[in-house]
């Protein structure tokens, strides 16, 4: 499965609306989903579902979302919590309220230390709260209606050091994937600028630094795996596990040191844009693997179709149950949003087009790019963009993209919902040098 954008907000907005970015108007971290946009739970409620959110949503800029609900979110139960470490007094932070009521010392510690508070206890961890609250929603649901439950974990996510220490015991470092080496200085200039902005302290880091980051990432995943079992158990206790559609996915990936890069952004390597997608359909008894190209916007139509709805009003969103498949996957980056808040003269625009065999990454600001023949070069080490023999393939992929983008531009006329800033951030000064 490929994310529509390699950063949180636009990617999640695509998943929740069944549209790509020009359709809903959310392009970067601080954009606000227009108030006339209806999300998936809105339509599921029309199908007779009880709808619930526990945890992260992030379809609009955080400063907006922790203070105001989108009128079209469609949730009957709205236990939003953006992340574990900030906005502890915000109107919409169900995790902070739970901490204050049950673990006031931990609430005060997080209030004082923020993201610097490392290695939270398993008892007070964000993933623990999400799972426990989700299990409560399942057990206390309106049994006269079917339930749609959206579970939003924060992990795995930087700063990679808030996992419970005991979860390290679940790890087997000998099975960590080997780091894919690369020369960042040989990459397109726009990608270098992006990398220097997003991860200046760790750019090119190897050895102990990389092992520490990977340990934190995998420990967070392992602890999350344990917590998800609480939700499965609640479904089984209620006798509805077999009849439940379960989807596990993510809004973006993390480079974790591969190709010398960390974090996220306009980095279209598989580690950053190819996200997990695990699906259990109702009464499914046997597993299988699929090589079909799937996009996050497809989750909208997949769920709505399973609920008995007709998702044809979202033509870009292809249900997994259907026969029609994507000819190619596309990930778009229109800046993370921080550059223009800080007064930079322009933001970075980049696009990835990926077919079954090829991947083309276009950096529009610098007219440079990357081309990888994935069947022969799955680790994306050999950039063929400047190879004259590949000029025809680049043109073919660009025409494929332009044809699709023209059709999309004709069909969409989305509003923009405004911007949500971070207090004091607009006055910050940041100089990035290569």
Language-model segment annotations:
Residues 361-363:
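Short beta-strand micro-motifs enriched in acidic
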Residues 1-359, 369, 382-399, 428-434:
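Formylglycine-dependent sulfatase
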Residues 410-428:
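Short, charged, surface-exposed hinge/linker loops at domain edges
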Residues 391-415:
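A contiguous, mid-protein "functional segment" used to position or interact
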Residues 377:
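Intrinsically disordered, low-complexity polar regions and short flexible loop motifs
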């Amino acid at each position: 499965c490929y994310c529509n954008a390699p950063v949180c907000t636009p990617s999640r907005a695509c998943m929740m609306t069944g549209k790509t970015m020009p359709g809903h108007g959310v392009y970067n971290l601080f954009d606000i989903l227009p108030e006339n946009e209806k999300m998936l739970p809105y339509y599921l409620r029309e199908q007779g579902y009880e709808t619930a959110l526990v945890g992260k949503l992030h379809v609009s800029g955080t400063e907006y979302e922790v203070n105001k609900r989108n009128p079209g979110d469609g949730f009957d139960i709205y236990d939003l919590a953006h992340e574990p470490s900030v906005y502890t007094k915000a109107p919409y932070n169900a995790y902070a309220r739970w901490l204050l009521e049950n673990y006031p010392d931990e609430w005060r510690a997080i209030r004082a230390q923020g993201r610097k508070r490392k290695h939270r206890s398993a008892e007070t961890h964000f993933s623990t709260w999400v799972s426990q609250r989700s299990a409560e929603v399942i057990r206390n649901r309106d049994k006269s209606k079917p339930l749609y439950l959206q579970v939003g974990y924060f992990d795995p996510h930087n700063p990679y050091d808030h996992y419970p220490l005991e979860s390290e015991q679940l790890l087997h470092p000998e099975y960590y994937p080997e780091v894919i080496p690369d020369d960042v200085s040989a990459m397109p200039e726009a990608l270098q600028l992006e990398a220097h902005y997003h991860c200046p302290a760790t750019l090119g880091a190897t050895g102990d630094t990389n092992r520490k980051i990977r340990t934190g990432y995998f420990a967070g995943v392992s602890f999350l795996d344990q917590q998800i079992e609480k939700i499965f158990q609640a479904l089984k206790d209620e006798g509805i596990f077999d009849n439940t559609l379960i989807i596990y996915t993510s809004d973006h990936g993390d480079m974790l040191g591969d190709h010398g890069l960390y974090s996220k952004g306009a980095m279209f390597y598989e580690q950053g844009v190819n996200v997990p997608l695990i699906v259990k359909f109702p009464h499914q008894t046997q597993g299988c693997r699929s090589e079909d190209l799937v996009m996050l916007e497809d989750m909208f139509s997949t769920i709505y179709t399973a609920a008995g709805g007709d998702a044809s009003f979202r033509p870009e969103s292809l249900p997994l149950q259907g026969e029609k498949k994507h000819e190619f996957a596309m990930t778009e980056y229109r800046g993370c949003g921080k550059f223009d808040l800080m007064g930079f003269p322009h933001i970075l625009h980049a696009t990835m087009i990926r077919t079954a065999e090829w991947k083309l990454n276009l950096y529009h600001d610098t007219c440079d790019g990357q081309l990888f023949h994935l069947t022969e070069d799955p680790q994306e080490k050999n950039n063929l963009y400047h190879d004259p023999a590949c000029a025809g393939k680049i043109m073919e992929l660009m025409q494929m993209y332009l044809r699709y983008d023209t059709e999309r531009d004709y069909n969409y006329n989305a509003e923009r919902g405004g911007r949500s800033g971070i207090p004091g951030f607009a006055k910050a000064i940041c100089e990035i040098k290569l």
